[in-house]
């Protein structure tokens, strides 16, 4: 049973691998709660993922089902998720290709006199184009977007120690370090990768930075 907002019903019907789809609207009847009593009625045990449930849903389920009938299935699902099919492995490799394209595009855009946001634009464009290429060659999901998204995490010069700093209008200068992080924005076909790299523009102006980098 898939319970979805009415506004997303068409998408659910086109994409979901489920023969039971129920739609609901804000403020109409009992909203998303309508289908749940019948769905759990008579069940001896009900598996849930406690840490993945919205508080309102968890509270409703707690009032609907006796506590002794609820069982956390997260450990079992976590083990299952560690087993990858050939299709999933291919997806991971393709996500890696998108990641490499983003890093290559970002590195090529780094230069003396260039503002940080130009690097962010370059990484997004490079990743999107590689993703589009892979989608066209290997996948038949017409609704899957190739666009990468999320704000680019990067820092340069004196801001280098701000780990989750976003790309700004700051102009980068020769000799400065430039940190690029792609955690959260390197995504392909719902598969995400996280990694980062540090570069310097030309020769390193402060040699102690190289020593710190070697330790890290």
Task: Walk through the language-model features, giving the residues of each.
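Active-site neighborhoods and metal-handling regions in enzymes and metal-associated proteins
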Residues: 1-216
